[in-house]
């Protein structure tokens, strides 16, 4: 016997259950912010029905992720692809905690950011974090590559490919005693992977849009990637950012695409 447990004005079955078979389903997203009592619904399912013990804490997660980041990098160097958005900022805070001076934050200015954003990013990450910071002015290079391009997916491909080349150029400059920078850390989160139909979903999801940070490396560019947030959703990333001590104006800032105004503007940006 299946019992309908929730309905709406337009949907006769919003949730249903079969207690005998231990099946509980919803036809909506309880995890999203505008689902009233969604968090309580999930809590009831996990702790009352499944019998899980609530022994997880954000402090424990911070310690675990810091240790994992430190172990991954070892004695090597890492550059952090920093956009100033919440995702890359959280990875920057985590990396600063884990490996400090072994990490260099690299901010690629493609000239398509919000007004005052490059200055704000540099202000925050040179004064609040004990890490090296490099501001790469690549505005002219991007303007030349994007001239006349109107297709959004092509813009993303161009921007993502050029990003890899810019980061690799910085990595080569940072070589010490012939030892290359091995790792590149970036703020890839799970929705990026889902929307791209990318590698970690097993390729079983449809491509909604490609993400510049998931574009394949061009020939001649090679890094080992560190993506500590690749199983996190945005609300979890924000909670982690607060636990790491990031200021609220970074953690709760309005999301903005990595390719910036190139995607917000319809047609060519030249």
Predicted regions and their residues:
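Extended catalytic-interface subdomain
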Residues: 183-194
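RNA-binding accessory domains that recognize and position tRNA/RNA substrates
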Residues: 1-182, 198-270
């Amino acid at each position: 016997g299946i019992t309908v447990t929730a309905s709406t004005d337009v949907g006769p079955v919003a949730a249903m259950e079969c207690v005998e078979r231990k099946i509980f389903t919803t036809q909506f997203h309880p995890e999203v912010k505008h689902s009233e009592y969604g968090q309580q619904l999930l809590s009831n399912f996990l702790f009352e029905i499944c019998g899980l013990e609530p022994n997880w804490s954000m402090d424990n997660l911070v310690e675990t992720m810091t240790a994992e980041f430190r172990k991954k990098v070892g004695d090597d160097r890492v550059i952090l692809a920093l956009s100033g958005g919440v995702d890359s900022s959280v990875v920057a805070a985590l990396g600063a905690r884990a490996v400090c001076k072994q990490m260099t934050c690299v901010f690629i200015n493609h000239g398509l950011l919000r007004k005052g954003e490059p200055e704000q990013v540099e202000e925050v990450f040179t004064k609040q974090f004990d890490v090296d910071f490099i501001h790469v002015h690549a505005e002219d290079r991007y303007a030349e590559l994007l001239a006349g391009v109107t297709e959004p997916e092509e813009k993303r491909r161009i921007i993502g490919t050029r990003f890899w080349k810019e980061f690799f150029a910085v990595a080569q400059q940072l070589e010490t005693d012939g030892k290359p920078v091995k790792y590149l850390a970036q703020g890839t989160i799970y929705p990026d992977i889902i929307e791209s139909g990318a590698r970690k979903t097993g390729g079983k999801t449809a491509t909604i849009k490609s993400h510049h940070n998931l574009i394949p490396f061009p020939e001649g560019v090679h890094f080992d990637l560190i993506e500590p947030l690749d199983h996190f959703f945005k609300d979890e990333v924000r909670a982690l950012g607060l636990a790491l001590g990031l200021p609220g104006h970074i953690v709760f800032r309005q999301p903005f695409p990595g390719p910036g105004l190139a995607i917000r503007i319809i047609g060519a940006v030249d």
